[in-house]
Amino acid sequence: MDIGFLNRFEEKIQNELLRICTQRGMLCGTLLATDDVTEHWDVLAPDYVADAVGQIADYPTVSVAWAGYLGLAVAHGWDTNWEACVRTEYKQYYGEQGFDDMDEYIVRHVLGLSLDSKEANDLEAIIRSCAQTAVTLIRREQIEPQSPMAFHVFARAIKVMYRIGAALELKRLGYKFEEVKLPPHFGSMPEC
């Protein structure tokens, strides 16, 4: 397995999706993140992959996009009640039709948005655009379908999509990176 290739692919897709989100005013050129939210992907990923892999052939955009919705949900949970969020099992994000309407369930029941609201429509549009771009970037690599490398490229793409979703929600909630200037003597503070 060419780990260097996978790392470069992940960086390329992340940069491209961040560019799209920034151009559309959904992010400000920075991928907002918290370690808690980022690391929670490792908990959700095995179940997500089990669902998404079966969707790739018929619904490639959905198989990537729903990871973004999971990112939205986890970032929202981090802001509102992290202890409850980390106990939320993957399938609790399912809609009435399971994986198929997970997006609508998360928007309506986790984020608390009306499906026909401007915010919900803006999120749907940016996640769809990012997922379509991710699928295009995967296809451009011309990797043999259903090969181990195809699986690993897909896994990297959905991990990035999850982080994009989380960043979108953190921005929507009002979080932003700000430079903090520490006083010059900060490093010489006495130990407690």
Residue ranges and their predicted role:
Residues 1-192:
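Intrinsic-disorder/low-complexity detector
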